[in-house]
Amino acid sequence: MSITRRTLLVGAGAGAVGLLLSACTPEPEPAPTRTRTPMPRPTAPEAVPAPAGWLRSTWATDPYSHGSTSYLPAGTDPTERQRLAEPVLDRLFFAGEATDSDHPGTLVGAVDDARRAALALISASDDTERLAIVGAGAAGVIAARMLADAGHEVTLFEAREHIGGRIRSIADDEQWPIPPQLGAWLLSEADLASLDGRLVDLGDRSLALDTATTWNAEGETEGLDGAPIAQAVEKAQAQASDAAVTDALAANGADLDDPALSASLAWMAAMTGADPSRASSWYPPHFPGDGVHGVIGDLDAYLGEQLEGVKVATASPVARIAYDDRGVSLRLGTGEALSYDRVIVTAPLGVLQKQGIEFAPALPFSHRGAIAALASGFIETAWMRFDEAFWTTEATIWHVAGGDALIRTWLNLQPFTGEPVLVGLVGGADAERFAELSERDATAAARASLAFFAAPADDEG
């Protein structure tokens, strides 16, 4: 059920967390600020018409996400995730894809880690305690469901006006044949199988995108090949120190300007969010296979169904978390302070890195070090519906090799929907650039990225 802030205040109880001293430990060194070369303003080609329908994500610039996922940059290792997952005084528990060791950066990881954190909290508490969860994404929803099923009183706080976090479905039957998915919705076959029984049986709620094609300025060309990346990573893992994936490729003699290699790296970035120029070669991002599965339907509504009996406060950003060995106090963005015995924090890594939530006292040094060491990944999605198809290929996954396209991966949903719908995927540093564009420039960049697939004028009619 949904509740107002007034209801929360009435039920908050008289207890409050005592006076807390700021931690006197040194701060971890922040990652150096990266600079990017300004991108020329995109120009849309005439051969690619303006879309009749347009939607896109901007997770990289969203203050409640600051990214789409997480990955390990060169010089870090998976133990950073384990450090961040450690409870603090058995009062604060962290959960989400960034703290999962087995499937980090994925929806499966978010679900599994929510279960881990919920079980840890249940073990540390009794059924008289008041519990809260910060963040109503997949991890927050799953944790809330588990705590409620265990007989606990739990309140779920979400900064946005809707639940789902970085899962975002737009249900609009008048504009789209299926709900556009702006967040996490693409899964490998293994992840799809893993989610069955964990979250929902997705067998009848997914599309199998399993035919791929690669195009350059001359037309269709050879498909992508992940072998050069795998070979470079294998050699890099035998070296004395870690290196970024692109550095490992260069050391192995690869030409980073090769269009086919650039397309392969863009495909990896679009599916993992990892920037190849920063990602670890010792613990590299997974190179996706030739196919993926796309989850369809209103995922927001499905997550909402899991919250029956849970108090949910949307449009309630948590600005400050004060804690000691007696409990936790949450201060909302409007100034209200609410007291709880224990809290699970599922805020995205990017929010923690940008200090979107103040902790008092500061988190332990190991937690702050882990937050600084991990990297936020970026994935943006652009949905485009056209009045009629301007392309000839029937493949469902398109790759762009060569040229200066900002979006190098496209999904063709026309074979499934019967309508000319394309979905652009962009990851890593290019996703950051795309998120920062105005709507006009983002649309132009998307159209320009499709130029290779447009049928030549003399082939039309």
Model feature map: region roles:
Residues 1-461:
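FAD-dinucleotide binding site
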